[in-house]
């Protein structure tokens, strides 16, 4: 064994290693290789989708590499500590995520067995089993997996790969320096209207996901880049502040109504309107991330209405992510303005326990199964039910820990949204849990 870290998913892969020291060298990567690096961020996504597997020195189960690899359905091992020193480019290795919580990297090509499952006769549980989706190019393939819709459609992949340009670099194109205008021109070639480029590309990406799962509900999370991630988009560094802690900074709901970004958010709204009204995909619903207070939530809804996308129009439901302790403590107030909640267990665990989810040093303390996190989820479910609001979960916890999924089902959660690679095994588990519960009641 060459290295060990946290397993992401439950698959296994073999291939040749490509050690990439930083994002400036991603052009060296070849499809089918095993990507080895220190840590990833959205700038790496163009090559991640072509990797046989991903291994990083740093990061936890909710790091960027972990989240993206789950959505892509490829194995990943994060937080190995020294993988960039333990292997060399061109070396053949086996990446195993099928041995429990620990992921292991072995030298050479090991033999393994593939188990297949016939899903044609699989029953549907009472709890809705939804899916986390981010890459439109994978949407139709993933839609073939038995599901009840998309509980989390991530917009960030479309931003980074289909749009690539910061929204304000398009709305304020004429104020940009000549060299930045040239970069924007290169990306937007074929579009005379820079704003139309953004709306069209974003609508195409969102619409592809909504179409793949139609008529099942697709809950789209509004953009949730942090400032350092927005800054990596073309022209982005001219519009984003440098923050000491972007994870807790200007992100999510706080951006949408702010005078420094409202015009950028308006473009998102235009794209959503196009998908719902022009494409006719009214199964597309909306979710507001990182909403700190009910007052902030109302401000976001007001901006959406001003831009022609009011809640309830043509059946539009608007959900809020429950990922901040205030979302739990003030759930009754949030219930007055939103149609439901989706628990973001990644950030909720981080903020309830005070643990940096991306730090390898405290990775052992980041545990969604902690009683404080479980109690927060249980309290939210009860409050949501009291006010007649739907509540689901779209964080990593149910995908990683079957016992956490079982806990949520017993608490009466309405839906569980999973990474594609966890849908079938978790569906089987939930069917068993519900069957046992019905037997006891009988």
Question: What are the roles of these predicted feature ranges?
Answer:
Residues 2-153, 157-174:
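Acidic, glycine-rich flexible loop/linker segments
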Residues 117-442:
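Conserved alpha/beta-domain cores
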């Amino acid at each position: 064994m060459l290295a060990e870290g946290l397993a992401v998913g439950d698959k296994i892969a073999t291939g040749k290693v490509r050690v990439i020291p930083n994002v400036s060298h991603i052009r060296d990567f070849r499809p089918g290789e095993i990507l080895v690096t220190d840590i990833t961020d959205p700038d790496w996504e163009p090559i991640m989708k072509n990797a046989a597997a991903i291994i990083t020195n740093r990061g936890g189960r909710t790091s960027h590499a972990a989240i993206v690899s789950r959505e892509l359905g490829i194995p990943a091992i994060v937080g190995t500590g020294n993988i960039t020193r333990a292997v060399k480019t061109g070396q053949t290795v086996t990446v195993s995520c099928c041995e429990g919580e620990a992921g292991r990297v072995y030298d050479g090509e090991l033999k393994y067995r593939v188990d297949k499952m016939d899903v044609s006769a699989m029953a549907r549980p009472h709890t809705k089993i939804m899916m986390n989706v981010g890459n439109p190019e994978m949407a139709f393939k993933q839609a073939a997996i038995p599901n009840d819709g998309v509980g989390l459609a991530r917009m960030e992949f479309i931003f980074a790969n289909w749009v690539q340009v910061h929204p304000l670099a398009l709305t304020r194109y004429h104020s940009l320096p000549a060299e930045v205008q040239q970069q924007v021109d290169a990306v937007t070639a074929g579009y005379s209207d820079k704003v139309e480029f953004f709306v069209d590309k974003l609508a195409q990406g969102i619409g592809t996901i909504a179409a793949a799962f139609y008529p099942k509900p697709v809950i789209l999370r509004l953009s949730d880049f942090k400032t350092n991630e927005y800054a990596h988009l073309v022209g982005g560094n001219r519009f984003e502040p440098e923050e000491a802690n972007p994870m807790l900074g200007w992100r999510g709901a706080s951006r949408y109504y702010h005078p420094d970004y409202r015009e950028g958010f308006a473009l998102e709204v235009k794209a959503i309107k196009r998908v719902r009204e022009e494409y006719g995909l009214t199964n597309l619903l909306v979710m507001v991330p990182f909403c700190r207070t009910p007052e902030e939530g109302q401000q976001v809804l007001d901006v959406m209405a001003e831009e022609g996308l009011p809640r309830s129009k043509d059946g539009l439901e608007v959900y809020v992510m429950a990922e901040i302790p205030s979302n739990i403590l003030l759930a009754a107030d949030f219930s007055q303005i939103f149609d439901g909640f989706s628990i973001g267990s990644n950030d909720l665990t981080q903020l309830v326990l005070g643990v940096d989810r991306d730090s390898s040093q405290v990775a052992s303390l980041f545990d969604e199964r902690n009683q404080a996190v479980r109690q927060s989820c249980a309290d939210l479910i009860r409050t949501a039910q009291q006010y007649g609001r739907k509540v689901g979960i779209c964080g990593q916890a149910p995908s990683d820990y079957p016992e956490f999924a079982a806990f949520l089902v017993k608490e009466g959660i309405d839906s569980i949204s999973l990474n594609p690679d966890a849908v079938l095994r978790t569906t089987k588990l939930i069917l068993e849990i519900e069957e046992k519960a019905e037997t006891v009641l009988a």
